[in-house]
């Protein structure tokens, strides 16, 4: 069966970028169709990414904290885990949120069409679904088709013991020995979960540090902690993967490579994601897609075709849900006739590991590459009363300042709940705050959050929580 519908706006993809764009379009009075290949809204983030991983990381954190309390006189005994119940709870979290999105779409009168959409012309999109095809004739389109995990040709991805992030989040089993290929955020988060559930974790990373985008001093603190849990093989890469009856055998080369192939019960391939730009027949609409699958846009999220926009992972790095949401709002408002631009000063990044690693604005490496003269100020959590009382004193908060203006241009936090503490730094950069603005803002005590203010005091030379400050010249 085939049907044909008309819309002022069609949004292709219902992840955070897509549904946010569709809902904003509807709120602005535009007749909107939202196309989603899967049966639920929310995309990778809500269904097989951000949200389920945080549910499992919460479980992992509770397990680890229960064990750690034994050192302080509270002994719970060895945690007993019921994988089926954990999986059911994770699915309940997802269902609650996807159900909420479906309700909001209905309330806004956004028409949802399920199926795989492809362009057939500059104003037409055909969606192939289980119940036939739907042709959408549109005035404007927003492409929010997301990304997928990178696959390597020498890896037997058809073997059930070779996972991508989606497979890892299904929580079908807990392998005795798990290899995580890639020391980025996704791999480390999943390693954190499976270590807490009982797996032995090896992490192989080709660079000289995990989380390569973050500054070395921040990652050093993180690495010191996780080295007690994971076997880190840095400056090392996988050269061969062979599936045998008794396990997955992996050969490696590099600084930390074992001499012989290693047997694993499962291998998680977490080496990045590739955009879905080449899957949409966007060329039929005249939209240019580069060789990697990215779609280039301007600051109003327009592609080279003026009435077709693109947002989210498909337009480039960083591939983060919160970036896509803001891009979606911009695209919707531009279509509605408003003057709006995507021009953020900062986009925060967070690894929700334990400890968390979070940064926003420029890193030191980026400041150097841009030729910016800068200074840093660090407040160690070893001097934080709240951190000591909460048994997380190995963290640190770092601010990066323009040397001439003293304005904050970047910041990073490594420590428990670091991602929750990062917002002040991001806002400070957006608002053009200098060190004095932050230092003179009274922060509640005792909190981990006050470490941001104390780092600013370190820069100003006014801190009394550390010895021998050197006052800044005004």
Question: Residue ranges of each PLM-predicted region?
Answer:
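Flexible, glycine-rich terminal cap/loop adjacent to redox cofactors
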Residues: 10-21, 26-38, 44, 51, ...
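A Rossmann-like FAD-binding core segment of flavoenzymes
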Residues: 111-114, 118-129, 136, 198-299, ...
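Glycine-rich flavin
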Residues: 2-7, 17, 23-174, 207-211, ...
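FAD-site-proximal beta/loop scaffold in flavoenzymes
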Residues: 158-175, 261-335
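Short hydrophobic core segments
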Residues: 10-12, 117, 136-146, 181, ...
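Glycine-rich dinucleotide-binding loop and its adjacent helix/turn
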Residues: 50, 145-200, 204, 232, ...
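Conserved phosphate-binding and hydrolysis motifs of nucleotide-dependent enzymes
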Residues: 13-18, 146, 182-187, 272, ...
